[in-house]
């Protein structure tokens, strides 16, 4: 193995000055969350009078209930029932009475019905904020009256024509292709066209899009400059990546692109994210990516300008949903719940729900319990704009209103595009088996683009000849692209932008020098507990945390887990990298060990010492305590980590057992993203683990599941290299943990890291390290073996363990007087499997005849099933098992049983 230098000078980093201030100021909120502007107070502009009270009630009734009578269904299947509250008579009003001049109450009612019950409707009266309601009512009413210009109508018509033609082209050239086309929902491209144009006009610099399969290929080729030839290559079975790339690829409907949109009033960079087939899973990923982009740009919550900056400046997140998944998937609720949370807010996401009124074969009547698929938005007081998909021009208006609302209030806004699906879930599926009535209507009607273009022709905006000419030209372009398939090679789009200079991990194992000068570590350690003079610190923290750490820095002895972490964070910051740690209790730590943020006991103000190590510190630690969610949070953090490699992103579970609430994210992003999409991530998961008698859900991070997800070879031919899909480590000392964290940012490649984290080791003296174990020339040890007072040739038995179990095994061995004949080897890195390190250890014990794998976990859990074949195949060692018997869950909750099991594990180990 080659020892490599981290490169760069931390000393130089300390002296670097930042052009702009960007550090935490006491009393102004923590880094990553700007204080909210003061709420505006509105004076009463005049109350109701006896003369107008009932009319106002009628107006507000249309604003509140008008959407229930709106003309939203392009198929005409939805029965619109009369809403009693919209009848003027119940307010004691007569249609004949005059409102003003010749304007009668009948005229008022008709006007209200035209505005609030047409092909565009809105829900907003559930919002508590008076200013928002007033703004929406005024702007919506103006929006409905707006007329689009000729060039805007023609742009929409041309775009939808091309989208429809693209679907027809694919169906002709590739009749067995599942393309998940946009037919029936072509109005969604009026949304995207206006979104890009409007965002550029509002000085948005970056748009991050999360979208599933429906209409994705159309969006890529017709609006996002994705070369159709590359799509045709994929359809023909060719790889989307160069042969040199270490990747397996993904399905056609998960292709991605990014491009620069050049609008009439400005430009905006648009990025579509890769996604799995697990619908809505991309939502939090896109949110995390968007927020991370704001940090990289020093915008929004990360801006040094606290006076004028607002969350959402320069970066816009856009999520496109399907009606069935939007209603049914729990990650939707979790993600929206994050939308205004500190350290997660984006300043408003624009949501488009492509509501084709059916999910696979489930129609809306069985697909949800609510009136509309977007009703979830009302729980968070977000407005919903409903639009009939047969009216693309109304979609443009709705998009303008949504962008304006988001710009003004920096909150999420939803557009419910009610449309239909021309074919089945895919084009090879027959939907008439289960939805015959719906599909009679679908088959009997013209397409959305055709209806819209007929209107444009009828109104004199274009001619049928011009439409045919445009159609022919577009078909020729697609045919020309198809002809180039055999002569076109794929383009490597990985490691660009902020990832420039990074690469895929090598196939060999590397060892990097992750040590740091000890005088600097003492400086960081002391700085990590430094508080302002007027800060009212909790009395117990002085002795347990501050004084204790200062003593450790003076003696260089007994450095515990939290101190090692603080030194790792501080050194990473001073080397020019940012750090973000999120989780439900990460500021303090579930086990009250971290205290990265301290709370003033008099004012509740928060102080993060690591953000003030040096004056005008360039890089920052964001401590993100979050809501009780796993899937959305882990997805958010994965998206965050994929945006910038010079940022250590960590998610810590409250207990390791709770990770499986995020299993979809782990399976489809964390473990597989690089292989599928060449998307790298250095996300680190800290999963507290250990059998201490706490019972199920508080004992195991199920390391076996992560090991099963690793692409490590059982036969170890070749042996594992750095190119495994993720690293799984079970460190036993604070220094080991320190080196693990630093290794996540030192190399020029990134891999996810799963840390089987400790609980009792956090403060255990045997897990503590000396300052020299962190110094220059030190690195992570994949395997830790013992130094023996007598000859290692006398060793007859070798016990392999992983994690804190070694303390129990060592104690039992020494009590049995077996120290001279039994060796204990700690396997600290499970994946990549450390074959070379273990070979070196085994050579130390030529007389050993008995090899045991001892673990706390049941036989069907822990590392056993992973290490056993690798020991046999790569090392020629047949291991005996010592551990708990197979169990249907992780651990017993009966104290007596736990104690008895623990004794039995030790007895097996030394049998």
UniProtKB/Swiss-Prot annotation:
Subcellular location: Mitochondrion
One Gene Ontology CC term in the entry: mitochondrion
CDD domains associated with the record: TPP_E1_OGDC_like (cd02016)
A single GO BP: glycolytic process
Enzyme Commission no: 1.2.4.-
Name the UniProt record assigns to this protein: Probable 2-oxoadipate dehydrogenase complex component E1 homolog
GO terms, molecular function: 2-oxoadipate dehydrogenase activity; oxoglutarate dehydrogenase (succinyl-transferring) activity; thiamine pyrophosphate binding
Signal peptide region: none
Family indicated by similarity: Belongs to the alpha-ketoglutarate dehydrogenase family.
The keyword Mitochondrion is annotated on this UniProt entry: yes
InterPro entries linked to this entry: 2oxoglutarate_DH_E1, DH_E1, KGD_C_sf, ODO-1/KGD_C, THDP-binding, Transketolase-like_Pyr-bd
SMART domains: Transket_pyr
Gene this protein is translated from: ogdh-2
EC category: oxidoreductase
